[in-house]
């Protein structure tokens, strides 16, 4: 396999390039009988769509999904579901000045060294544009998990660059472009991003994703651990450089008497484990944190080399996200849902649950 498919029983194969005719995915293994229409998927795609605020790329893509197969009379048939999203606003000329050079921090150098050829238009296969099919597939996973188990997957931004965002309310999350759970912080975030765009620079972010309502018992020991698969999937999201569950790296400073979640007849007293022990879900909420690096396509000139290995100065023009973390929340939600539905089906196959 070439690393374009995620999942064991619920499999998603992603295809396309940023400036190609279309992008999409094939979802194989979706159980039959799930009510599904394009509107179910479109609602999630609209949350990720570019051009929705001044703080993200101004590329205007409608991201209208087309269901090509696997659905008949409004329900899934159990056969592969083909999903297509056409690219309509690519401006390939914006990349002519970097066609033979490499952006510091970008995958274009690694792609060229691996394949010996690269598509410089919008980053080609390495573009965050390719997260749209992931969100589309995740919408199906979310709907099945909710209908079968009442599982809810949602997320928010907890930090933008140097600005920490204290959690206030889930109700605040959909009301701003940042998916910030605290409306009072939004003006500060907007001012920071406005200055960042004027500087021609970029910044990173931290995203939190939470899955609630799943039962205990999902996951496998050793190599197919639930938390390992979550980390594997999340690292497939563009610009993610770190993944942790529960207390994560804070566990280093904790003592065992603090970190171990005490168990009472009413349930767990805390959730430092992030909902997973020994690679298997505990029934607690699964909590995942992502560290997202700054965008590498910036207007600030930086040193690099061209394909001949000669030193050059690189400046990236065109339309780019100054912080890819702003649109990352629905993508991270989709990835978590895809891992969970896969393990739910594996649990049902092995243990009948």
Curated annotation (Swiss-Prot):
Gene name of the encoded protein:
aroC
Tell me which residues bind NADP(+). Answer: 48, 54
- Cofactors demanded by this protein: FMNH2
Q: Which SUPFAM superfamilies match?
A: Chorismate synthase, AroC (SSF103263)
Q: Which GO terms describe its biological process?
A: amino acid biosynthetic process; aromatic amino acid family biosynthetic process; chorismate biosynthetic process
* Highest taxon of source: Bacteria
UniProt KW Kinase keyword: no
Q: What class of enzyme is it?
A: lyase
The UniProt entry, under PANTHER family, shows: CHORISMATE SYNTHASE
- Record-listed E.C. numbers: 4.2.3.5
A GO MF annotation of the entry reads:
FMN binding
**Record organism:** Bordetella pertussis (strain Tohama I / ATCC BAA-589 / NCTC 13251)
Write out the catalysed reaction. 5-O-(1-carboxyvinyl)-3-phosphoshikimate = chorismate + phosphate
Concerning PROSITE patterns, the annotation shows:
CHORISMATE_SYNTHASE_1, CHORISMATE_SYNTHASE_2, CHORISMATE_SYNTHASE_3
Q: Which residues bind FMN?
A: 125-127, 238-239, 278, 293-297, 319
**What intrachain disulfides are recorded?**
none
Record protein name field: Chorismate synthase
Task: Provide GO CC annotations from the record.
Answer: cytosol
Subunit and interaction comment: Homotetramer.
